[in-house]
Amino acid sequence: GQIGGVIYNSTHTTYEAYFKTGTEFGDEIDLGVGGRRVSEFAFEAYSELSNVASGTTPTATLKIYANDGATYDGVDIGTQQTGGANYGAKMPGTLLFKSDAKALVAGFHTYRVTDINVDLPAKVTWTVEFDGVDNDTVGSGKTAALILAGTDDVGSSLDDFWQKDASGWKLYRSGSTVQD
């Protein structure tokens, strides 16, 4: 995002994360110093849309949350592995912004959400939820993946991500091979 300067940016190698429709997932980020009024937000996704049902328009919806929810005790601070009782991170809580659904484009694409105009706290979680794809089988022609990875240029982010489904929020490390 930017007003007078970039408050978070990362360059990346490709790391794709696929989740079933109805699951939000995204990155917790610590924003750079200075004003944190975000006007624009961009994220990258990859989608395969060749077998999407006729008349269906697959979409992505961006949400930005303050990390002011309950304390999450699911990561052990000593080992940085999920399942520990000592991590103490705050879960995403207050919804600060929700975009209109953006129509997906096949292949790799950068999606820009403009006219946000929200003041952000120092730590937020941004998520994307896909709709109109099933994500059951990569290569099925009806999947979408959020691109998560990177070297932080401005601000910072750990090697983990938040997932929200019907059971609530869970934190996973990017290197973890098992998600619920």
Summary of predicted features, one role per range:
Residues 1-18:
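Boundary/junction segments of secreted and surface-exposed precursor proteins
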Residues 18-33, 109-111:
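Short beta-strands within extracellular/lumenal beta-sheet-rich domains
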Residues 26, 38-40, 113:
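Hydrophobic residues on conserved beta-strands that form the core of alpha/beta folds
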